[in-house]
């Protein structure tokens, strides 16, 4: 066989590799869909809002049991609602948007890597992203972050293709359009615009290397039009929302508008009231674990990046500069969550790919990665074994969470330990992909079924049904989470999600006082202590989310509640299709 034939044969391998890589991605991302319900903290909230959209026809103003939810714009909830209307199952609908957006993100990384380098680098970049711990975690969660990561990646894709591949303004405008879509999904969708900063630096320092400059007229108008396109995308939701609020003359809608435009954007960033972390939180506590395996490779990758930047390689400078700016942007804000920096991960995989072939051949890196897998595997195995032999700490955990997952940990740990044995000779780095595939395969099937009862209040409502039957009854929720709305087979009322607990208790007492038929209060046992209710008349209905829940009937009312009477608004919800 001559050299030309060998080259053709080698080239033809890549389409097969690409196909099987995306098959693997689809399996890892979609496995487990339909096997579990929405789990706290955020999933039940978004699922309930989406379900309510379909049931009520109110799509512009997200609500949870009639109370408006101003924390996030509605795009992500629209996507869940669309699939719920299509399939009629919240179990299927709630995970599909994140899964599909994650697949699109993988494709975008593959395509731009291929255009900037070659198919080989594209395969490596896509594999690195797919096998990054945080990426898969969010791909399999119904949180907004996988979707906003997708829109931000489209923005970065459009700008990189515009700056470095082909001079067509449509890519520039596409980037800004999806920045706008990102903003009405979650406020930080504008982040790709930060890539203009390293681009301008590159243009100033290496003007002879600037492809865009050679093909661009000096007019600033086309550049400014990008911002106009972004505003047009934002206005798709923003303008109708403002018009509807103005015409409604509803104070609660005006409060919704002000909250989502100001408190949940500027105030939340500059003066956050929760998730307070130090400036170095992402560098010390998030990146080392959640960006595995790339995080381990950073000591070897940084010299490669430095060398590329010295040569003026915009393929590295632009994404890397953008990643640094994104990390700085989120680090400056006092409120931090690990998931906030997810949008930087696709670009990190992109700039790691050209050099990862060299990195995996480093013995120290390969052994380090294998060592991480070994420690995690032994930890899983040891944890499972401790439960089997009834170690005291394991029994305490079992009692606390009401769960006996010991065989799951034992089997999963055994399989991943087998992975370390198989990869202890030869290419040690292969331990990571085998480990991650095994872990997610086990967790998304067996693990989901184990956690289902613990992560939902189904058992509580099952016990309520045993106590009061299926007759017409309305349950008032006090100091609750959204999953109690989502899983309730009964009509429910509540007194405002953020209303102080004592006000909720007073309002619940007044509500119950009005009639002695068909009304019940579901409340944490610790709140039955203020003289409004008789503790001995409270009926235990079980534990959920580490809380002991009790059911109060009219007979549990005391003669007089010492709490101050309140005019708190009462919200109600009648489930059309209860989640089962």
Segments (PLM) and residue ranges:
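Transmembrane-helix motifs of polytopic, lipid-linked glycan transferases
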Residues: 96-116, 154
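Membrane-embedded architecture of ER/inner-membrane glycosylation machinery
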Residues: 2-6, 10, 16, 173, ...
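Short acidic/glycine- and proline-prone juxtamembrane loop motifs at membrane-interface regions
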Residues: 95, 134-148
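Membrane-interface transmembrane helices that cradle and orient dolichyl/undecaprenyl
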Residues: 115-116, 155-172, 182, 356-360
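Transmembrane-lumen/periplasm boundary regions of multi-pass, lipid-linked membrane glycan transferases
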Residues: 46-49, 178-181, 190-337, 347, ...
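Specific aromatic-rich, kink-prone transmembrane helix
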Residues: 108, 148-165, 348-351
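Extracytosolic helix-loop segments that constitute the early lumenal/periplasmic catalytic or substrate-binding loops
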Residues: 27-32, 45-68, 75, 82
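Transmembrane-helix signature of polytopic, membrane-embedded enzymes
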Residues: 15-23, 109-131
